[in-house]
Amino acid sequence: MTLAKDIASHLLKIQAVYLKPEEPFTWASGIKSPIYTDNRVTLAYPETRTLIENGFVEAIKEAFPEVEVIAGTATAGIPHGAIIADKMDLPFAYIRSKPKDHGAGNQIEGRVAQGQKMVVVEDLISTGGSVLEAVAAAKREGADVLGVVAIFSYQLPKADKNFADAGVKLVTLSNYSDLIHLAQEEGYITPEGLYLLKRFKEDQENWQEG
């Protein structure tokens, strides 16, 4: 089994991912979605957590070998980023969604030198908007952001466009396509459910029609 499928299997088993194509969830944007993901749950399961963190380390070594500092997004990327930095013996920082409104007004907590080569850690990629804002903040502070790593991606076309437009490389350990096919193989969903999940990936607005 590939790492992507192994992680997908863990996410399903520990219920970090729920699939309900016949009774969809409603996202904050109002979109009806057949999938809900809470990767913070992974922190409660040592075997899953170790699989993910080791996967991150290998992915970063392969994709971003010149990395000098790991940064986690607040809050979901912080624990994973801290563990990765420890495993790689690298400095760690984290990036707030907006600057503090008191004290020094920091948006990045930790010490990042001008030109320091950074990899940003996120837990989930939907459209990529929030992590790309974090990347922009890090660049404003003088970091040389090499790219973003994440546990899981919904593989939405909007995310592909956003990362391409920003010129930011994205590496994910697992993804929507691997997960939904594995879910059908392991009996979490029916063939009809798989069909609906495939439609959602193609058209988030109209996947329930037809």
UniProtKB/Swiss-Prot annotation:
Record SUPFAM superfamilies: PRTase-like (SSF53271)
Annotated 5-phospho-alpha-D-ribose 1-diphosphate binding sites: 96, 100, 102, 122-130
GO annotation (BP), single: 'de novo' UMP biosynthetic process
Cofactor dependency: Mg(2+)
Keywords: Glycosyltransferase, Magnesium, Pyrimidine biosynthesis, Transferase
Enzyme class: transferase
UniProt: orotate binding residues: 126
CDD domains hit by this protein: PRTases_typeI
Pathway: Pyrimidine metabolism; UMP biosynthesis via de novo pathway; UMP from orotate: step 1/2
Entry-linked InterPro entries: OPRT (IPR023031), Or_phspho_trans_dom (IPR004467), PRibTrfase_dom (IPR000836), PRTase-like (IPR029057)
EC number: 2.4.2.10
Cysteine disulfide links: none
Family matches, as HAMAP family: PyrE (MF_01208)
Family of this protein: Belongs to the purine/pyrimidine phosphoribosyltransferase family. PyrE subfamily.
Known function: Catalyzes the transfer of a ribosyl phosphate group from 5-phosphoribose 1-diphosphate to orotate, leading to the formation of orotidine monophosphate (OMP).
Subunit structure and binding partners: Homodimer.
Name by which UniProt lists this protein: Orotate phosphoribosyltransferase
